[in-house]
């Protein structure tokens, strides 16, 4: 009986404690002062503790870095409302792109464009053909780091040079790749911190001075009309079959409803070919496999020469060379990129690695303080440090995109750069913030925060790789146009997570929704 009374008493105490605690941490609509700040701290800690409380929890062992500030425009001050490991360096994945894109936004301007010139040895136009109509000694194309250049641009250029019926021959088709100083590596265009599996995936395309279709290409796989037969491979554009031999190891499967296509591709370091394996459904129709271009220079020379030859222009020789070395070359054709504003928007919405790496190298070519021997990417990293003025003790950045796991950045430095760009007097319309994905509406956030208070008012950059998730941005209750509203800036990073990314994303989103409710109630 005595034990029963003790147990009953303990249960009553536990219930009373939970009631008191529940009342303490409830987020009241009218509470936006210091008590409200204390409440938000307790609530965020509860979310993280519930996630990591035991080994059976979905994110047990995950390392968290979280920082949140409230911005009051009436006094221009940022007040911290939550901080956990804000000075600890984490691998942030694509949140690294904030450093790269904000730096080029500050210094190059939204109207910046990239111009890719096509030089000839004599004046040439599509009508007259130049002083000697039938032959050019060379066409030299100088890559200038335009990540948006497409195969359609090449087709347009080929039509320009072949449109004159008297134009019959080009002795040399040259590609000038000297815009980047690539250093002494085996292939200095390949980011040194990237892994082979990155380079053989489309998200890890190599950032070369001349880029076509984001340095990717499509292979069209057609199933055999005989079960057990080999599918066939084809290409859309001239010259692609010469550039990339395809070895088919796949087979055509049966017509049963359970039959599905399981095509995969792989490269071998000792081979110029690509290997296609798996099964191809006989009734599945043509499948398109998009693959990275591992030798972008050779791809350009092979495909552009084939396009010219399709137009009746003979190409005698192709090579890597130098344009305008005599100062007497003539710029006969030019490809112009979209404005930087459009390219930044695309980069941030899609989290495009190639664009970010190209921006890094653009800044490297612009960095006059770098020595001549400094590789362009390294000069770009130094330029970012000079531009953002973030102490190097708060971050280590090794690439422009965040694809490397050797980037180590503190939540404090991430929230600082996003706060600074929002309050930048040179961007009164908050154009940069407008380029970021918007909760439930656009980009990599289009499927997150749906039917929540955060929908439409959270602008943030996502980051994700195995074991890593991050989100850095701002909550603007009244949208971008209200400069007098209070807002919340945040940076959340999770590292070493054993859980599926979706589980960690859910925790991050819970925190952001909580912060959203807090600012809406203040």
From Swiss-Prot:
Function: Carboxypeptidase.
Keywords, ordered alphabetically: Carboxypeptidase, Hydrolase, Protease
Chain sites annotated for binding substrate: 461
Catalytic residues, chain numbering: 94, 97, 351
Family: Belongs to the peptidase S13 family.
Record-given protein name: Penicillin-sensitive carboxypeptidase A
Activity modulation notes: Inhibited by penicillin G.
Keyword Hydrolase: yes
Naturally occurring in which organism (per UniProt): Dictyostelium discoideum (Social amoeba)
Swiss-Prot/TrEMBL GO biological process terms: peptidoglycan metabolic process; protein catabolic process; proteolysis
Phenotype of the disrupted gene, per the record: Not essential for cell growth.
